[in-house]
């Protein structure tokens, strides 16, 4: 099954709110999700979001492909950088060290 990590729109008219979900790529945008892995609120001043990094990394390791919007959120949270380091074959200590550097240089 080809899975995607993408945004599911909920909320009322002119007040969007999104859930980050893992879903079969053949399903419609608001179809039944396999798992909810976070949320994103673009209306708040800080564009608030909360992502379950461990579950997203699990699904990425299973072959799930994020959409562009989902990838932007993952990049903002540092999950995309962590996934990149895992793909390079770094061990956990090196990854933690690189993530601390990333936290310091972050432009959020």
Spell out what each predicted region is:
Residues 1-108:
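Structured, basic alpha/beta domains of bacterial-type, RNA-associated proteins
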């Amino acid at each position: 099954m080809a899975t995607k990590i993408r945004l599911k729109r909920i909320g009322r008219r002119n007040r969007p709110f999104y859930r980050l979900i893992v879903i079969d790529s053949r399903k419609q945008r608001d179809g039944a999700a396999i798992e909810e892995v976070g949320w994103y609120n673009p209306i708040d001043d800080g564009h608030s979001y909360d992502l379950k990094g461990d579950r997203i990394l699990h699904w990425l390791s299973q072959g799930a492909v994020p959409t562009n919007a989902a990838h932007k959120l993952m990049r903002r949270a540092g999950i995309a950088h962590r996934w990149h380091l895992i793909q390079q074959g770094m061990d956990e200590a090196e990854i933690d060290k690189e993530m601390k550097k990333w936290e310091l240089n972050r432009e959020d």
